[in-house]
Amino acid sequence: MAILLGLVVGVLTLVAWWVLQNYTYWKRRGIPHDPPNIPLGNTGELWRTMPLAGILKRTYLKFRKQTDGPFAGFYLYAMKYIVITDVDFVKTVLIRDFDKFHDRGVYHNEKDDPLTNNLATIEGQKWKNLRQKLTHTFTSAKMKSMFSTVLNVGDEMIRVVDEKISSSSQTLEVTDIVSRFTSDVIGICAFGLKCNSLRDPKAEFVQMGYSALRERRHGWLVDLLIFGMPKLAVKLGFQFLLPSVQKFYMKIVQDTIDYRMKRKVTRNDFMDTLIDMKQQYDKGDKENGLAFNEVAAQAFVFFLAGFEAGSTTMGFTLYELACNQDVQDKLRAEIDSVLERYNGKLEYDSMQDLFYMEKVINESLRKHPVVAHLARIATKPYQHSNPKYFIEAGTGVLVSTLGIHHDPEFYPEPEKFIPERFDEEQVKKRPTCAFLPFGAGPRNCIGLRFGRMQVIIGLALLIHNFRFELHPKTPVPMKYTINNLLLGSEGGIHLNITKVVRD
């Protein structure tokens, strides 16, 4: 009995020592930080009253003038992180010294949760090789070849909206309709599939997209492990994605591969690149090829990124245009002028002339960055010029995109929607990393060109054809949902829509 009691006391002593060491790390280092709570660290409000984006924004804005170094300490559950408070050091981490911070340090489980093992999460040389292979899929030439396909989906969206406001109410929840637009765009551009999401309210592509991003497989305790201790979660075999989501996307990818291989279909698209890599793997070239599960994972993340990031950006932009009618009028005038110069047609070349549109989208992404924070991990020890701010290998790094975008030093009156902030002269006055909607450096968003193209096409068609005004159901200022991985609106964005009548 005495031996057992001694063992229990010994174990409890070790646990207490670990807790004390872990949660006093930043205090012992003398690094400014908010006092942590055990076991949630500085994230006690997470998914209950505030999204992680809000917590990190608050931390950034609080400590940006209160620290004698480039970062503050932070505890994401039990993991020690830094929150960068100096945009020049953001550039150091993302660009200058990328070789020391090249991994994101987030959960991915190749064995038990294969779709999470994708370009956004994988690490080291494996990531570098895959990134190089996929980059050519998103060249300007490829975008130009897909333009008419995206435009056709956009024209269908206009017909659907026109029918809805003619036959029933003039009020629509716009994030729903633009989500269906981006779902159909990604379906046809990535998989060669006509998803019919715009016409079918129960389209499986849309429902599975929502499930992958918003439905939780576990309660908060397992999520604590997955997000706070990802390596331990992998060792324990925990899975993040729902089984129904895994099954759906695996089947879609397998069916697409089978169809193209049997019929010798070539579309020169993202899926063709992945199929080529799978064939290399099947021939024994493991270094340059991809196994089926890896192919499915890349297709999955491409769909989710295009579906959610594109639709959310469009939704937030329509919201801001409804709040700022003068901006909406100015944008519509530009669209009409460009269309008139190109015989009433939106073309790839005419899209390049929508300069004010670019500023409007950038200002929307500034106020509401869909990816509201960036994550990295120190893969090597890093010595800052101030010795106190040494970073140990394995320390997590967080960049609050939302915080930087709302920093009054870079954006005076940050809550106001002012597209002119992105006039060329104004942009030159700001640091490089004061605007990070797509990240920066070698690990920025690979699908940036595609994402911008689908957003510009969708918004140009909508603003040309319809006027958007606020509905009382939509809050001002915007309220963000507390349980999304990406930034999203709480309760949707309900707007009044009327058709633009021209003489």
Curated annotation (Swiss-Prot):
Catalytic EC class: oxidoreductase
Stated EC number for the protein is 1.14.-.-
Q: One MF term from GO for this chain? A: heme binding
Alphabetically sorted, this entry's keywords are: Endoplasmic reticulum, Heme, Iron, Membrane, Metal-binding, Microsome, Monooxygenase, Oxidoreductase
Required co-factors: heme
| Gene Ontology cellular component list | endoplasmic reticulum membrane
**Where found?**
Endoplasmic reticulum membrane; Microsome membrane
What's the chief localization of this chain? Answer: endoplasmic reticulum
Q: Which domain of life is it from?
A: Eukaryota
Residues binding heme: 445
Which InterPro entries does the entry mention? Cyt_P450 (IPR001128), Cyt_P450_CS (IPR017972), Cyt_P450_E_grp-I (IPR002401), Cyt_P450_sf (IPR036396), Insect_CytP450_Detox (IPR050476)
The membrane topology noted for this protein in its Swiss-Prot or TrEMBL record is: Peripheral membrane protein
Instruction: Output the Pfam families linked to this UniProt entry.
Output: p450 (PF00067)
Among PROSITE patterns, the record links this protein to: CYTOCHROME_P450 (PS00086)
Free-text function comment from the UniProt entry: May be involved in the metabolism of insect hormones and in the breakdown of synthetic insecticides.
The UniProt family comment states: Belongs to the cytochrome P450 family.
The identity of this protein, by name, is: Probable cytochrome P450 6a19
* Organism encoding this protein: Drosophila melanogaster (Fruit fly)
